[in-house]
Amino acid sequence: MDYKAPRRYYSHGVVARQQDFATDIVTRRRPYVPYDRPNKFSRSLVWTSKEYKSPEGNNMPRTNDVSPKPPVLGLARKNAACGPMRSSSLRKWVCKYWKDGKCKRGEQCQFLHSWSCFPGLAMVASLEGHNKELKGIALPEGSDKLFSVSIDGTLRVWDCNSGQCVHSINLDAEAGSLISEGPWVFLGLPNAIKAFNVQTSQDLHLQAAGVVGQVNAMTIANGMLFAGTSSGSILVWKATTDSESDPFKYLTSLEGHSGEVTCFAVGGQMLYSGSVDKTIKMWDLNTLQCIMTLKQHTGTVTSLLCWDKCLISSSLDGTIKVWAYSENGILKVVQTRRQEQSSVHALSGMHDAEAKPIIFCSYQNGTVGIFDLPSFQERGRMFSTHTIATLTIGPQGLLFSGDESGNLRVWTLAAGNKV
């Protein structure tokens, strides 16, 4: 499908495309909804405690309201190779022959014949279509369409009712990242961001000033869109509500990283950015100034997550670090967890059935460790044939994983199970 269309130029570096592929995705138009709040399912928000207290002592309340749960890819369940759950503590590794469909031992096998060993966690769909590493998965709020992008240069749209791919769009470029906030979907491309609204079919091309390279990571905070690039710059757009045709205004560029920006997290009034330069920078969301640089990792920082009053980071150096504020307001490492002989590629967090916080940690060997917070006691594991490169939390117990082979899996954590 060719997504190109006639352009109409606006100020502030925004290009609108008329009758673009967002029109194909949405069958009917809905009243325009301005962007005025973050998506409560964003993985970059503080998702555990009901109230977050910033270093300055300001309380950050959470909302407990939830949106209606979308259908969970019902017809795709036939693709889910979920074997019976093994509860034995000795069976912590999936059988490599079973993964290839060649194990002859059956129930007598000493290894797991399941893609997970966490009570209540089940894989409900395996979506096949991409043939290279997934760079992002997004389920827009209120939508029954799931979006995924890959370095194979395609954007795929999946119907949540049937589990079928309803659109495969050739981007003519390698995708770098994908997120959703409210009704908006943001796609990171070389030197630009494509934004479209699933409710109104509005389709925009946010053009960066100059050559900044691939957009590797994005997040939204305080009504601003932040985009981390391969040049080390962080581009900032401000969301506006005064014009339906020009909802995002280019604001500035944050400089400081000497290598590619790889990940973001938001906690309180702070933006955290990780980079190939092995550092984490802390930016004040009110002034957009860098107020601290953290240098404890010895490899690329791959993922960041805010939990309660802490920052959690992962790296290709094989460590997961927990950072907390000291009495003088400095972030310091209070815990380091090392994964022997395996780098750490992605982090994500959610609550279990008892509303206890758990964290998912993806390792290079295709395993995802599931741990309690703050103890980091292991609770279970997920498995894949390749490294899981992206983990995205959805509404009401949904979890999406995408690996380096292009396989996209949908998981659900059953409510009410005792864990």
UniProtKB/Swiss-Prot annotation:
The keyword Repressor appears for this protein: no
Domain of life: Eukaryota
Disulfide feature: none
Pfam families associated with the record: WD40, zf-CCCH
UniProt keyword annotations, A-Z: DNA-binding, Metal-binding, Repeat, WD repeat, Zinc, Zinc-finger
Zinc finger (C3H1-type): 89-116
Single Gene Ontology MF annotation: DNA binding
WD repeat start and end residues: 129-168, 210-247, 256-293, 296-335, 383-419
Bilayer-crossing regions: none
Repeat keyword on record: yes
Protein name: Zinc finger CCCH domain-containing protein 62
Gene from which the chain derives: ZFWD4
